[in-house]
Each structure stands twice: as C-alpha cells, then as structure tokens.
Amino acid sequence: MINLKIGQKLQLEIERMGINGEGIGVISGRLVFIPYALPGEEVLVEITENARNFSRAKLVKIIEKSPNRVKPQDRAYHEMSQSHIMHLSYPMQLEFKRDVMRQALEKYKPAGWRNYELRATLGMENTLGYRNKLQFQVRRLNDGTVIAGLYQEGTHHLVNLDNCLVQDPKTQEIINHICRLIEKFDLPVYDERKIGGIRTVMVRRSQKTGEVQIIFVTSTPIILDGQVWPELREEPSKRQKNSFVKFDKMLSALTEEFEEIVTVAVNFHPRKTSEIYGERTQVLFNEKETITEGVLDYEFELSPRAFYQLNSEQANVLYGEAVKALNPKKDDRVIDAYCGVGTIGFAVAKKVKSVHGMDITPESIFDAR
C-alpha cells in the first residue's frame, strides 16, 4: 500500500460518497476521504491525516466538475460542517441517502439483508426553511456584538448563523432579535473560560398553529420580579451577582414583539459539559404550557423539553409510510419504544387494540398522556 505524507498533493478521481457526505478516492488500494468532493470528479487534494487503513485530505481544486454539483445557497456552508451535502443537487441527495442505507446493510449484514428492497427516497418540494426548531449557542464578541449559532466542527469557533436557510424564518427572526435584546439590556453571556450567563437558546415553532416556545439555558441564576432562581443556599458575592441574568426587561420586550410566543422557560445548567440542558427548568412566561402541533389527522401538545421531529412536513410522510408498512390490525398490541410525545403510537392508536409507549424523558411522557 502506498505511503502518503501529510501535506502531499495528488490528483484523484472520486469514485463514491461516504456515509458522512465526503467524496472517496482510491490510490493504490488506499481510501482517501475528501470533504466537498463528488463522485465522478477529478480533483487535486492535499493529505491532512493518515490512519492505518485510510487517509483524509482537503479539496484544493476541482479539475473536472460533476454535473450534479450545485452552488450552496447558505453563506455559512463552508464554515459549518464537512458533512454537509448542499453542494450536491437535491435529486442526487435523495439517491445518496438510499446509498447510505445500502452501505449500512452491506456492513452490518442483518438477517436476510440481500433480499431487502431499497426504494427511492421520498423527498420534499421545499428544501429550505423546514426546520421547526433551532438550538443555538450564544456568545459575545470583543466589540460587544452578541451572536448565536453552532460550533464549527472540531473547534471552539462559534459560527454566526443569522440567516440559516434551512431554519423556519420565524425562528431565525426571533433568535436574531434575542441577540439584539441581550446587547440592549447588557445581559451576561456565557464564556467557557470565566464568565457565566446565557449559554444556549432554543426556539421552536409549531407548523400547525404558528405558536412559539423558547428556552434560555443559563450557567448562572436569573432574577425575575426581584426573585432569584434557583434559590441560593448562601449569599452570593458581588462578582456572582453581576453574572445573574436579569430577565424582566428582556422578557417584556420579547413577548411584546412576537405575539406568537406562548411559552418562555429558563434552564439552569452551571456545569462545564457538552450537554445542552441541566436538570432544572423553570417557566417564566406561559400563555400556554405547551404548543399544539399536528401530524396526519391528529394533534398533540409539546412542552419545551419534549422531543419532536425537526422536519414537520417530512414527519407526515414518515409516519404515513410507517403506518402503511405496519399494516395494523384491530387485535394488534403495539409497543412504541422511544416514543417521545407518542406521535407514531397515536398514528396507529385507532387502528389497533392497544398502544404502549416508553421514553426516558419525563416531559415527553407527560405530553403524551
């Protein structure tokens, strides 16, 4: 097998795509993974990593371009992740997803896998603005500007996502406004090195009703109507008090600006971990404790922490196909494992004798009931 050196440049033909969306070329029997490269392309690459059985490389130049290559519309595309496939035409993205299933079957070989029929992936008409929920980290830059977004893969660099094209436009508008309010009221923002404050914001919008719920995740207590939450066992120092998040003005300004907001909650997460949420959540504002969402021919309630599919349009397609494939009978008893708020179970509930759901998230079970 050829010995490749870090920094070495070479020309490759891309033979296929890997499960993470990278192009794969082969040189003397050695696999080379190249993000952003597409099958059929002739490319110039630079080796960045060597493992025992494969290498990784960065794309330097496309010598011969694939007819399936398109220009990504999202300006943050190259900053966000090496596994994006927005440079691949949508029909071929659907074909790629089917190929991922084929690769998985060939690798894990479940019983009878050679007889499985891999049908065409069911796509959607509008491929932008479909994500009903965002969960962005928040940071303050040196000039005082507050940004919200996601970390660049493998780094601590937060990419500002102020116009993420796959997000529901209203959720994007709300998170942008929240950033401006944090600046206006000079609220503390989390810094992993020394400063406590707001660290993450979740915004979710019902595609059925347009209702919006928000969760602020903070590393320090908050102050609302003069009360500190969560309650402290001892008197905080002046420095600690300065990092408390004073929510009064923020909450009023936010709910006045967006009448769609029905729930605002805060989650206390003081630990330095990669987990998004802490154990304690407190509702600050609630016209309703939940938002009403719908799928197929039924509606259900979602509390802020409950899980639901990010793509409401495709959830309808997914659940519809699941019901058809299950072909439920009146005497059937169904177990909905990892049920979330019970959406799949509800889809068959009227067609079977009983449905039993189970999940590890108490909020999801509460909503399902």
Regions found by a protein language model. Give the residues of each.
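Short, aliphatic-rich beta-strand segments
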Residues: 203, 210-220, 299-303
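Short, acidic/hydrophobic/Gly-rich beta-strand patch recurrent on exposed beta strands
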Residues: 23-28, 149-152, 215-217, 368
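Short beta-strand elements
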Residues: 129-141, 146-152, 203-206, 282-295, ...
